[in-house]
Amino acid sequence: MTDAALETRGLSKSFGALSVASAIDFRLEKGARHALIGPNGAGKTSFVNLLTGALRPSGGTIHLDSADITHLAQSLRVKRGLARTFQINTLFRRLCVLENVTLAIAEREGVAGALLRPAGRHRAIIEEAFSLLETLGLADAALQPVNALAYGRQRLVEIAVALGLAPKVLLLDEPAAGIPSGESGVIVTMLERLPADISVLIIEHDMDLVFRLATTITVLVQGRILIEGPPDAIAGDPRVREVYLGDRKR
């Protein structure tokens, strides 16, 4: 078996008697499009916080590209190639789209503060940022302030900023959250354009988006993995319908 892009072994987290993650063995393959779903309170956010280092585990290990990152600081996990978007938009809303992505790339390169001073290297960073926007279909909005964009496009910019960090693994935390149903298609289109070598874990409540994009789905319930498999198997599993997809027998 090849090395996973991201893997947990026996990952656990408890707050006193409350267990939010119970011995989770999870594997994100390289280049995968993998979704994590589950009802409210299933432990999805806690699991992602453990992956990113926002929470310290009570037990178990986390490996990123075979390296043990269990006790690594959040900032160092980002530098190792683990990037996350958030449910709540965290962009610099008064800056233009290009500036937001440029700042992310500059942070990755360790020259964020130096952007205030002109230098040839800064031009290369700006060119990289614009090229990324072109790839993702956002070049037309490059010079627009983020707060002038529709909310759906703001979420696209958030993904572009995460990609500016050059991640090996991208954690998409509810990318469709707060987006009107008529705008969710732009999220799908952009995610379909993501580079194939980036491993993607999507945490999402929008089942249409999940089943369109993911080739593997993990269902989390009460801090444990209930089932994992391809979309057809998940959609047809009676346990999933009962706890999550709304087909509870009466």
Predicted regions span which residues?
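Glycine-rich phosphate-binding loops of nucleotide-dependent enzymes
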Residues: 2-250
